[in-house]
């Protein structure tokens, strides 16, 4: 099973986030995934509706049931306000290169 995030390099994270990466735990629907959508399917993204808030904070362990106050009212765990098609293009290239390399290595 391949997941795109397994192939995102630290250099790509640094270039996209400029040292402000909130972490993978709160990235779902954040800058990276929204940037990919802006690059691949911009007509499906309504950036004017993106909330701008601090990333959600969770304890470093699983807790059930999850406390509703841990999730921002928007339902988004981090803001996608800094997303761009350019970031999406960078991310797609890094992931395609990484996945292609691994598949070529595995099936060579």
Placement of each model-derived feature along the sequence:
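Extended, histidine- and acidic-residue-enriched regions that form the cofactor-binding/catalytic faces
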Residues: 1-108
